[in-house]
Amino acid sequence: MAPKLLLLLCLFSGLHARSRKVEEDEYEDSSSNQKWVLAPKSQDTDVTLILNKLLREYDKKLRPDIGIKPTVIDVDIYVNSIGPVSSINMEYQIDIFFAQTWTDSRLRFNSTMKILTLNSNMVGLIWIPDTIFRNSKTAEAHWITTPNQLLRIWNDGKILYTLRLTINAECQLQLHNFPMDEHSCPLIFSSYGYPKEEMIYRWRKNSVEAADQKSWRLYQFDFMGLRNTTEIVTTSAGDYVVMTIYFELSRRMGYFTIQTYIPCILTVVLSWVSFWIKKDATPARTALGITTVLTMTTLSTIARKSLPRVSYVTAMDLFVTVCFLFVFAALMEYATLNYYSSCRKPTTTKKTTSLLHPDSSRWIPERISLQAPSNYSLLDMRPPPTAMITLNNSVYWQEFEDTCVYECLDGKDCQSFFCCYEECKSGSWRKGRIHIDILELDSYSRVFFPTSFLLFNLVYWVGYLYL
């Protein structure tokens, strides 16, 4: 029994040792194959020798083909994001991948490898274009977690150099139609020191592309598209090839509609409420008028905070100013009405009383003594004295006339198409004139103000949105 157990133990131990040896052999083979695929030692040596040979007599201070022909730079730009756009500072922010391709015959090499992909450590060892962004205020390259730069060298000497940049570029906004304005914000770049005789920039086919706009921070703008141009700019240092990308932006009106337009319209409508308040309610109408004027002043100040201090009138300035004039005119309407209402003619009761109970000492200078029966009274049948005047079959006593009556009869106020009293309406001097009753000014205003404001809005919105 014991020899059998010993034999079984020896058999199991032998099988275990053999299987372990097979696993180790397979692991060594796989690891050696993986190492050979990723970075063969012979290829590492080959690349190192190629780079050392290329840079041995290379002068990075000299551009390719110097003294022979201009260096041609092919440009590609991938727009990662745009925004935000600042109307106050007249600038916008853009995040791009900027790629430049050129040929340097000094970097040709013979090898089984057609492309050498290198990191940013190689950038400072070869010549690269001195490209600048002409309208940039600030610009920075990305360095996290490593410098965002790529360098590729083909065996025929072609070089691709890309880097990621965030640029705050200047954009001169024309705000005449603000907030219904559209803009073309440029990104301008060129060589800093090489004129067109030494360096030429070219756009490649489909050279400008844009990423998904969902991550863009445009906020108040819609991206309408882009276009690129090439031009020659003449300076005192020479003629330079200048490349420009225009980003077409259209402003969204939602924010300004809620913030400015709707409050202004409601304030103007609120000022019309005074036309339906009794004209003798002076405190109520005055308080309403002053409140709406102060509200419009506040709204105009707030509207200007989102704009730079431009010297011309914008579309929003025009709208706010007209709304302010409507509100101010509503207040002045009541001031006019209140002034002429205070010059009101004496009431009918007072006139009737004056006629029925006149002061005999004023209009009957003396009594006539005649003999008459006791059941009869004697009356003076002479014409009325000069102190009494007649106008439109109505009798007025001159001593009861106030200043307004005198001015109206004199034609001083009536020549301006306004009447103090209804009797001014039919005088001989009124022939061919339009009668406007100043006491009915509220009735006229209830129609005139809404109609004129509606016409203004019609012209304003059609003119700025469709013309």
Swiss-Prot record:
Family, similarity comment: Belongs to the ligand-gated ion channel (TC 1.A.9) family. Gamma-aminobutyric acid receptor (TC 1.A.9.5) subfamily. GABRG3 sub-subfamily.
Tissue occurrence: Expressed in brain.
GO terms of molecular function: GABA-A receptor activity; GABA-gated chloride ion channel activity; transmitter-gated monoatomic ion channel activity involved in regulation of postsynaptic membrane potential
TM region positions: 257-277, 284-303, 312-332, 447-467
Organism: Homo sapiens
CDD domains noted in UniProt: LGIC_ECD_GABAAR_G, LGIC_TM_GABAAR_gamma
Annotated signal sequence range: 1-17
Membrane topology of the entry: Multi-pass membrane protein
Protein name as catalogued: Gamma-aminobutyric acid receptor subunit gamma-3
SUPFAM superfamilies: Neurotransmitter-gated ion-channel transmembrane pore, Nicotinic receptor ligand binding domain-like
Record lineage: Eukaryota, Metazoa, Chordata, Craniata, Vertebrata
